[in-house]
Regions:
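Structural signal for alpha-helical transmembrane segments and their membrane-water exit/capping regions
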Residues: 2-32, 42-59, 183-185, 217-245, ...
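Long, contiguous bundles of hydrophobic transmembrane helices that form the permeation core
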Residues: 2, 174-235
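Transmembrane helical segments that form the transport core of multi-pass membrane transport proteins
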Residues: 36, 58, 62-65, 213-311
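Interfacial loop-to-helix junctions that mark the boundaries of transmembrane helices
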Residues: 2-9, 30-41, 156-168, 200-205, ...
């Protein structure tokens, strides 16, 4: 039973581990395996996840959300704030953390509305938040795991990365605002009810300040001003000394998934027949192949897999970010919202899945059309 539960909870890690082990039969372990592992990506990813876990434990993001919601005076403003928290928040705190924080928060906030309004808004708003987190996160190298990895691999400057994804981010924001306006058009113009009470927790300002400083150190490592080892050591030592329990909230399964895929991809690259076949498929079709691969494997594994067989990293960045749209597993972050719906509104799972799939496909078609038009 424990194994079955683990496989269900850690499906991607389990598949990655099996693939890594199978590839070892074709390429027996040797010293070259050490070259497979991208320590820079793992170190920075661990550091960022630790910092975000610490800030989340201190209720920083919850308090930010409440401060913004206190200024809302209409249903449209309420929806725009809830969606905007995920869209803009994901650029800094990653798509996973923004959904883990703000989707449960949304259920609490919407519970203060009239029943009919609450039922009309909940499913569309959570769908919008999920798309917002996935598309907002594509703007920055730290917005999601595949961006962090591909940014490090590309050698781009921060400005080059931002300019690459900026056009898609702007169109995404406009689409989300238009959707919010359409959803709220039939609702009452003013919000009903009050904000939920602040949980009785006391934030440790020293830890918040420490995490803020460590976050700046990590950013310097991301843009290659500081060695990644310095950032990793600073985060690990400071967290062990000041906020050790936060380390229990780090997503170690994601780190292990990266390691497994690094081994699998490294071994595939040493199998000439497969390497040549995949390179031929990718040539000139990097964006579309990345989008399609993401629908089946999700965009993080797609980025890890395809990056070993093409030098067109910019195209993979576009493809894996747009590829986060589509199926429910195209971005693993989308499962966070689905699980929340299944827990809070189990009878609405079907309606959510239909709206999620339809809206994702519409966004994907529009953004792919934009990619075709601007040619990058």
């Amino acid at each position: 039973m424990k194994l079955k539960r683990f496989l269900k909870q850690e499906t991607v890690l389990s598949v990655a581990a099996v693939l890594a082990v199978l590839s070892m039969f074709f390429v027996p372990p040797d010293a070259d395996y050490l070259c497979y592992i991208d320590l820079r990506t793992l170190a920075i990813l661990f550091s960022l996840m630790t910092i975000m876990a610490g800030l989340r434990r201190q209720g920083v993001f919850d308090r930010m959300g409440r401060a913004l919601l206190a200024r809302t005076g209409s249903t449209l403003q309420l929806v725009l704030v809830l969606v905007g928290l995920c869209f803009f928040g994901s650029m800094i705190i990653t798509n996973d953390v923004s959904l883990l924080t703000f989707v449960p928060f949304t259920f609490v906030v919407l519970s203060g509305l009239a029943p009919d309004t609450r039922r009309a808004l909940t499913i569309p708003v959570v769908c919008m938040q999920t798309i917002a987190a996935n598309l907002g996160s594509m703007l920055t190298p730290i917005g999601n795991p595949q961006n962090l990895y591909l940014y490090g691999k590309s050698g781009m400057s921060m400005a080059e990365f931002l300019l690459l994804m900026f056009p898609y981010t702007v169109v995404s924001l406009l689409l989300l605002v238009g959707w919010a306006v359409a959803v709220c058009r039939k609702q009452a113009s003013s919000c009903i009810g009050a904000l939920p009470e602040q949980p009785n927790t006391t934030a440790d300002r020293k830890i918040i300040l420490l995490d803020a400083v460590l976050f700046e150190v990590c950013l310097l490592a991301v843009v290659r001003v500081l060695p990644y080892g310095v950032a990793f050591a600073a985060v690990l030592v400071c967290t062990l000394c000041a906020d050790r329990s936060t380390l229990r909230n780090v997503d170690y399964s994601l780190l292990l998934t990266f390691v497994a895929f690094f081994i699998f991809i490294g071994n595939l690259g040493r199998i000439p027949a497969f390497s040549g076949w995949l390179q031929a498929i990718l040539a000139g079709r990097e964006v579309l192949v990345a989008v399609l691969a993401s629908q089946v494997t999700s965009n993080v594994p797609a980025a890890l897999l395809l990056s070993g067989f093409t030098d067109e990293t910019a195209a993979l960045i576009i493809g894996t970010n747009l590829g986060g749209l589509g199926t429910l597993i195209a971005s693993m972050a989308s499962l966070i919202s689905y699980r929340q719906i299944a827990r809070e509104l189990p009878e609405e799972k079907g309606r959510y899945f239909k709206l999620f799939t339809l809206s994702n496909l519409i966004f994907l078609v529009i953004l792919l059309a934009e990619w075709r038009i601007i040619g990058r």
